[in-house]
Structures are given as C-alpha cells and as structure tokens.
Amino acid sequence: MEEITINIDKIKINDDWKEFLRDEFQKKYFLEIKKQYLNAINQNIIIYPPANLIFNAFNLCPLKEIKIIILGQDPYHQPNQAMGLSFSVPKNVKIPPSLNNVFKELQNDLNITPAKSGDLSSWAKQGVLLLNSILSVEANKAASHSSWGWQEFSDAIIHKLSNEKSGLVFMLWGNYAKNKEILIDNAKHLILKAAHPSPLARTGFLGCKHFSKANEFLKKVGKIPIDWKIV
C-alpha cells in the first residue's frame, strides 16, 4: 500500500494547525507515536486512514474559523471507510449505523432529509472539527492503536482550543467523549452531551437537538451558524 509507506513527519498538515500544535509535535509522547507508526509500516501493517488523511480533520477545518468540535473515538477499521474525520465515510461508501442515527437526529431537529452520502467534509469546511481521539487504527482491529499516545495528543488539542479560543461548541457523544468535559472551560464554551449515536447505545441521542442548539449558540456569540445539509 503506497499511501502508508510515509514517514509521519512528511504527512501534510495545515500551516496554522502546525504552528498551533508545534509544542505537541516535539513532546516525548508524540515521538513515541511516530516510532510506533514507523514500526507498523516496516512490518507492512495496513493502517487506516491512509497516511495522507490522518490529519484530514485539520486540513479541512480552518483553525481561524473553528466553531464546533465533534469528538469521536477511533477511526473505522474496515477498508475504504476511514477518512480522518470522526463519524464520516467517503462518498459511495455505505453509511455506518451511528452516522445513520446522526442523520435521523438532523431530520428530527432541523427537518433535514437524511443524506445519501456519509461524507461530512462540507461540515469541516465550515468550521466543524471532526476529531477522533485516536487518529489511526490497524486494519480490522478496532482500538488497536489506543496505547500509542494519540489520546494525549487529542486531549491537548481540546484543552488548547478551550484555553485559546472562545465561543466554541463541544459535542460529546457517549461516555468516552463525555470524559473529556474536564478539559473544557464551560464558562467560555457550550458543552453539549448525549448518548453515543450507535444503535447499541442506550437511548439518549435521538432527541438531543444538538444541531439546533449549536446554531443558536453560534448566533448568540456572533458567528455564522452551520449549514448541516450534506453537500
């Protein structure tokens, strides 16, 4: 697989985000991530998403325009699904059950007809950071990179955004994401919590109205609301 034979240092990341995260890239834990990544490549292990998409969440969502963070756990581990955006899958890929429930809630909340595509890139381009807590996974092995140190990286991003920005919306779905609430200053930002949209989760996601609540908050703080229709 040509796309995974790339040193993590060579993977493109938007310049503004690169500067924002410069200190994290120099820390011991991130050097360990790079080491683990290269070791996996040298063993010809297939990693998702493809290397050029590992930082896709940052490349599509401009730092200066960030408004909302939707936190996922780790990438899809089946072929052709992971694209570096939490919950998102490429066009023409079957929409996963959790994302189906997200679309159902959009219909309930804002009367948006469920999309035929699961590609959420249009959200990212408007300022929605679709961030997975863990940024890579071995093919067919869910949560296989959970010990690499990615959580320290994503926690640092959440905490730094909370400290340096104001008027952001953090959507925390499921207990894993809710545990990140301690990283966020709720005096400066809106924290929206709900059950995970997975059909396996207990009821509590459908009816949360997070999308309308987020847009109401954005308007309140003088920001342009998100057009949640999938383009």
From Swiss-Prot:
Highest taxon in the source lineage: Bacteria
PROSITE patterns cross-referenced by the UniProt entry: U_DNA_GLYCOSYLASE
Molecular functions per Gene Ontology: uracil DNA N-glycosylase activity
Database matches in InterPro entries: UDG_fam1 (IPR002043), Ura-DNA_Glyclase_AS (IPR018085), Uracil-DNA_glycosylase-like (IPR005122), Uracil-DNA_glycosylase-like_sf (IPR036895)
Catalyzed reaction equations: Hydrolyzes single-stranded DNA or mismatched double-stranded DNA and polynucleotides, releasing free uracil
DNA repair keyword on record: yes
A Pfam cross-reference name: UDG
One Gene Ontology term from the biological process aspect of the record: base-excision repair, AP site formation via deaminated base removal
Enzyme Commission number, as recorded: 3.2.2.27
GO cellular component, one term: cytoplasm
Main subcellular localisation: cytoplasm
Keywords, in A-Z order: Cytoplasm, DNA damage, DNA repair, Hydrolase
Protein localization: Cytoplasm
Role description: Excises uracil residues from the DNA which can arise as a result of misincorporation of dUMP residues by DNA polymerase or due to deamination of cytosine.
Family: Belongs to the uracil-DNA glycosylase (UDG) superfamily. UNG family.
Protein name: Uracil-DNA glycosylase
Source organism (scientific name): Campylobacter jejuni subsp. jejuni serotype O:6 (strain 81116 / NCTC 11828)
Gene giving rise to this polypeptide: ung
